[in-house]
Each structure stands twice: as C-alpha cells, then as structure tokens.
C-alpha cells in the first residue's frame, strides 16, 4: 500500500515558490487536458472584436492567476490534510484554465496582464489568512470566489462575437469546472458567506477586471 508523503514546512514553501513561478512565467505551466479550442474552427474577426476578446481573455487569465494563488495560500495553512489535498487538487485543475486562456491570448496577438504578480501576491495572502482562520472559512471563500468567477464568465460569454467559437469553447468549459468547484467547497463544509461579504468581494473583483482589460 502506498504511503502518503509528509512535507516539512520548508518543503511546502519551496513547492509554493515553484507553483508561483509556473503560474507567473509565460508558457511555463502545462495543462492536464487539451484546450477545448483546438477542435473549433478559426474564423476571422474584426480588429475591434479581436482586441475586445483579448481583453476579456486577459481578465479571465488574471482570474485564474488569482485562483492559483488563493488555493496555494489556503493549502499552505489548511489545518486538515483532506482540505489541504482538496485545495492542491483544485489548483491543479485551475492550471488547465490558466494555460487555455494564455494560449488564446497569444493566438489573438495580445499579452497577459503585467499586474499578475501583484494580484498573485494579494490572493495568496488572502488564501493563507482564510486558512489560518478555519478550514470552513477557507472552503467558504473558495465557494464565494468561484461564484464571482462564474458571473464574470457568464457575462463574457454574452459579449463574445458569434464567430469566436474558440474562446466560447474555453469559457464554457471553465464555467462548468468553476461551478463544480463552488459546489464541492460547500459540500465539504464550507461556510456560506453573507451578502455584505460577497458584495465586498465583487467590488475587489471589479478593480481587477477594470485594470487588467488593457494592461
């Protein structure tokens, strides 16, 4: 029977540093699943639509950077091993989204946000603090965050040009995955955040979306 490996605090810090580099350095992360966009035809879009879609995908990419940092921060401070493993597994799934968005951004001739390191650091800190408070709060924060992500994805799907099947396929799969993450976090005992807290989170999310649309 295989035994579970136990990491020292130093081991975990080194793993966090490795995760941060794979998240922030271009083309350094590798997905477990191929992008849903690969089976979609590549239709020509106007320059205006191309720039708009690139901006939307840049927002989504930064959202995945934040998700990576949030999960890694929570995994570092989670009290129960099963919660830590759940956070680490969720972070692995989010890598797919991260890479899919990055690939699509480059296909559109654009770039990822220069603000990603800042948002990674902020999200990592928030995740670590949530994990210190309690695992229930940590899981609840995941559910509330994923709810915000789902709202953004739904809004972006409505804004996509009809001919952009590639971006649509990516966002639809991301939406499905994020809904599952939110449900799993609550089923695992996550605390349901009250409306005022969710409102505050939505304000922070708007700061991120407004700032990363162009830069």
Swiss-Prot record:
EC number: 1.14.99.60
Single GO MF descriptor: 3-demethoxyubiquinol 3-hydroxylase activity
Top-rank taxon: Bacteria
Main location (coarse class): membrane
Binding site for Fe cation 1: 64, 94, 97, 178
Binding sites annotated in the UniProt record for Fe cation 2: 94, 146, 178, 181
UniProt subcellular location: Cell membrane
One GO BP: ubiquinone biosynthetic process
Bound cofactor: record note: Binds 2 iron ions per subunit.
Cofactor(s) required for function per UniProt: Fe cation
Signal peptide: none
EC class name: oxidoreductase
Membrane topology: Peripheral membrane protein
Any one of the GO CC terms: plasma membrane
Function: Catalyzes the hydroxylation of 2-nonaprenyl-3-methyl-6-methoxy-1,4-benzoquinol during ubiquinone biosynthesis.
Protein name in the entry: 3-demethoxyubiquinol 3-hydroxylase
Organism: Pseudomonas savastanoi pv. phaseolicola (strain 1448A / Race 6)
């Amino acid at each position: 029977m295989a035994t579970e490996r136990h990491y020292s605090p130093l081991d975990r810090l080194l793993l966090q540093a490795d995760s941060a580099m794979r998240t922030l350095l271009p083309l350094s992360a590798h997905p477990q699943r191929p992008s849903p966009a690969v089976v979609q035809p590549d239709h020509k879009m106007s320059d205006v639509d191309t720039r708009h879609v690139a901006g939307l995908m840049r927002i989504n990419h930064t959202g995945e950077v934040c998700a990576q940092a949030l999960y890694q921060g929570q995994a570092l401070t989670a009290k129960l091993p099963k919660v830590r493993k759940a956070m680490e597994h969720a972070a692995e799934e989010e890598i797919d989204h991260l890479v899919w968005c990055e690939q699509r951004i480059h296909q559109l001739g654009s770039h990822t946000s220069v603000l990603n390191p800042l948002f990674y650091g902020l999200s990592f800190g928030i995740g670590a603090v949530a994990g210190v408070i309690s695992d229930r709060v940590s899981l609840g924060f995941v559910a509330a965050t994923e709810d915000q992500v789902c709202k953004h994805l739904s809004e972006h799907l409505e804004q996509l040009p009809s001919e952009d099947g590639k971006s649509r396929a990516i966002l639809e799969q991301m939406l499905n995955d994020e809904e599952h993450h939110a449900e799993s976090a609550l089923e695992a005992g996550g605390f349901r955040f009250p409306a005022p807290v969710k409102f505050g989170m939505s304000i922070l999310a708007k700061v991120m979306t407004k700032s990363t649309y162009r830069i």
